Amino acid sequence: VALAGLEEKNITVKHSTFCPGFYKLTDYSRKFNDWKRTGHGRVDTIEAIAQSCDVFFYDLAYKMGIDEIHNSLSYFQFGQKTGLDLPGELGGILPSREWKKINKDEPWYRGETLITGIGQGFMTASPIQLALATGAIANKGNLLTPRVLMHSQSKDGQSYNESQPESRQIPIKNIDNWELIIQAMKQTIYGKLGTAKRLNNKLRYTLAGKTGTAQVFGLDPEEKYIAENIDEKLRDHA
């Protein structure tokens, strides 16, 4: 989403957002909480990715709108099968106004755009889809069809077929935007406030990544979280 925001000029490299620990829409009573309830303070794009600042992405999603988010993420194969050479693959869900109308017979709401911006709400993706998208960022837009089978050979050994993944290039408007996202993902591991800094322990290779905010059931603003009063499957297991 950050990459799409940069490519479509919804934000600039110097853009920053103040995070008080929640995001609120005008004329909308609900607060959209950050995973860090005390807030991150003012963060730029690199810091927002490294620290996984939900408020930054709520705000960016609001600027972009669901139509632009849907179109941008479609390039990365979300909501579609990856072409993995195993049976039973599902495409997941990349929600849109049209998807919700068809599947829920309901209009799209502004709040749903915000949570889609952090990969929550109706959106679903498989681990292989996330790996595919991450690889596309690392390869500067080169999207490779994932393969499990390396090669096949006939019983008599006469024929040999090597599995070749197909590749597709995601349109690039500014390569510097892609470099910035890669640097931000490195800061997730190596930055002092990176959410995956614990992985930075005698690494023998350069690592980049991005953590996610788990989606849990909601509590009313006046309610307190008491694990004993909640079904075990809904409890915080972090």
How should these model regions be labeled?
Residues 3-238:
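Beta-lactam-recognizing serine transpeptidase/beta-lactamase-like catalytic domain environment
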